[in-house]
A protein has these predicted regions:
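N-terminal helical capping/dimerization or prosegment-like subdomains
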Residues: 1-90
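Active-site metal-coordination/substrate-binding segment of hydrolases
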Residues: 77-111
């Protein structure tokens, strides 16, 4: 099986996981002692790390400031940076900003 076939075989799982993350209102909130960016960003980080664990990664949450996932051992690693917080949600959305909308086979929409 080539890489394209492998990726295609994981499409539904990837979209399901993306939907799990999009459903979380991760706008900057009121800081709390253990949630420096508020409740929403902490929930998004927790869910993102949970998804990574489900995929077989070891995860680390750094006091809800950020987290990372890793796999394997050794001196050389590959790092991929991303974020789960979002800008404020206004009212000009064509679709629900907290739901992954599927439009046919090849188009997915969200915020």
């Amino acid at each position: 099986m080539d890489i394209k076939e492998q990726i295609h075989g994981l499409t539904e799982e990837m979209l399901t996981n993306l939907g799990r993350l999009v459903a979380i209102d991760s706008q900057l909130g009121t800081p709390a002692e253990d949630k420096p960016f508020g409740e929403g960003p902490a929930k998004a980080l927790e869910e993102g790390l949970k998804i990574a664990q489900e995929l077989g990664f070891k995860t680390v949450n750094l006091d809800n400031y950020c987290g990372y996932a890793e796999m394997g051992e050794g001196d050389e690693i590959v790092g991929i940076a991303g974020h789960l917080d979002i800008v404020p949600v206004g009212g000009d959305w064509s679709y629900d900003p907290f739901k992954l909308t599927r439009e046919g086979e090849d188009r997915k929409s969200t915020r």
